[in-house]
Amino acid sequence: MYIYGSKKQKKTGLWINRKLNSKFGIDIELGAVIGYGLDIPHHMGIVITKKARIGCNLSLKQNTTVGNKQGLKEDDFIIIGNNVDIGANTCIIGSITIGDNVTIGAMSFVNKSIPANSIYITKKTSEVIPVINHKKMGLI
């Protein structure tokens, strides 16, 4: 509606965009191309750049960013295929391609292309550091 529409359709697109942003905290830039079946079960904190080209049946969880990085050329896009599930707190950045039937785990950082029929996770390490007992050391 916004890209190829008449003046009235573009104005309506701007109005819808502002309403989505203010009511739900969703920032989908005008110019993003999204196929049917977009599912956003928890809608807070969603950001999608106008450089996104998204297929059908995408599921986005809360606090997900599909964004471009500085220095992208005019013809660089983030391409996301069909039947993609993106977990919460995920950041997808740059001119990359995500294939069909991909699952991206929560809290992932994606800056490289992902082939079709894949599961992508960002490995994180956790470490528990014990607190020194200051009484035993005579510090207190």
PLM feature segments, named:
Residues 83, 91, 127, 138-139:
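Accessory, usually C-terminal, subdomains that scaffold auxiliary metal cofactors
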Residues 116-137:
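Conserved beta-strand-loop-alpha-helix hinge in the C-terminal portion
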Residues 24, 30, 35-36, 41-50, ...:
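Left-handed beta-helix
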Residues 1-25, 132-140:
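Terminal amphipathic alpha-helical/low-complexity segments used for targeting or macromolecular assembly
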Residues 5, 63, 125:
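Residue-level marker of positions within ordered structural domains that often coincide
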